[in-house]
Amino acid sequence: MLKEEDKIFTNLHGGQIHDLKSSKKRGDWDNTKALLDKGRDFIIEEIKKSGLRGRGGAGFSTGMKWSFMPKNSEKPCYLVVNADESEPGTCKDRDILRFEPHKLIEGCLLASFAIGANNCYIYIRGEFYNEASNIQRALDEAYKDRLIGKNACGSGFDCNIYLHRGAGAYICGEETALLESLEGKKGMPRLKPPFPAGFGLYGCPTTINNVESIAVVPTILRRRASWFASIGKPNNTGTKIFCISGHVNKPCNVEEAMGISLKELIEKYAGGVRGGWDNLKAIIPGGSSVPLLPKSLCEVDMDFDSLRTVGSGLGTGGIIVMDKSTDIIYAIARLSKFYMHESCGQCTPCREGTGWMWRVMIRLVKGNAKKSEIDELLNVTKEIEGHTICALGDAAAWPIQGLIRHFRSEIEDRIKSYSVAIS
């Protein structure tokens, strides 16, 4: 359990005013110049030592990612913050944008300095109108107070931060599709290599980070890497914002230590499963793109490695709880429809496969299928997985794989019941 004094996001639920003056009282912008004066190498090394891993889903080392940027580039370097939060079941970044905007902006300055970027773009989801307005007000405050812009915080470093609104496409949450959109083109993922650190925005070195990954940076640097690394578990350090939704008594966002058990998280903060733990059927532990877990596996620790060992993933930390009243086949079919709708259509396996999977899933919901089609569907998911430019194909395949792995008998019973009903 995370101690109160170790929480980074002290205004996560918006109980206090989030303007610049109030944010400073909570510790934001506290002697930021001193952190900048320590130099680029110090910042990158501290983030590496902290063990911070990307909070957007991939879980790659943030400090390592920054170190890939060239130190003496002839081209301008860019930092891009991915605030295009569109994963079903995930709303953590939204609360940071709403209630902790200055943590994000200060993090942008420190991260930009670390990678040598004089320009930073915050790419925000198109539907986040109020959040975009909130961030823009915070940016205006920071510019007025000379915390960013020319000679940011009196450090001699120039850092301009721009807000860019998306247009509602889920695919633009993929980092290279986001760059395409930012350049004014259709948001379609790029082939890699080249990677953004070498050829990113406008063909220049670019680092893309998630909102939460950037927002925790100032606190890590102030309290030092050893403090952050002491929280959580080895290789899964620090705090994490978890979004708990679905069939719980008190849906909420909560900051907790990495490695807390899934059951403890739900019972302590979300008031438990509706109808009690015995009424639990399954949980999606990391946003809609990771495989679900049946009740028997739902006491797993919430970290990257533990969830991988049980065949799922931490993803964004979006926990979707489903009780025994849930039609689990329909629930996954609905996710299939989402991925079909959001596919950009660039890759044939994803363009054709997501639609095919959804049509089969709809028949499985009714039971209007043959048992052999279950294995056929599973084989198609494996043909899509790993055969697309970006991970949307994987995200569409994994929920179905999880369903078949853990609830095959329920699918078979549905098919049998349908056959009996029409005979």
Curated annotation (Swiss-Prot):
Transmembrane segments: none
Binding site for FMN: 166-213
Pfam families reported in the protein's UniProt record: Complex1_51K, NADH_4Fe-4S, SLBB_2
Obligatory cofactor(s): FMN; [4Fe-4S] cluster
EC number of the protein: 7.1.1.-
Binding locations of NAD(+): 54-63
Catalysed reaction equations from the record: a quinone + NADH + 5 H(+)(in) = a quinol + NAD(+) + 4 H(+)(out)
Superkingdom to which the source organism belongs: Bacteria
EC supergroup of this enzyme: translocase
Record InterPro entries: ComplexI_51kDa_subunit, NADH-UbQ_OxRdtase_51kDa_CS, NADH-UbQ_OxRdtase_suF, Nuo51_FMN-bd, Nuo51_FMN-bd_sf, Nuop51_4Fe4S-bd, Nuop51_4Fe4S-bd_sf, SLBB_dom
Cofactor note: Binds 1 FMN. Binds 1 [4Fe-4S] cluster.
Record-linked NCBIfam families: nuoF_fam, PRK13596.1
Stated name of the protein: NADH-quinone oxidoreductase subunit F
Classification of source organism: Bacteria, Pseudomonadati, Pseudomonadota, Alphaproteobacteria, Rickettsiales
Gene: nuoF
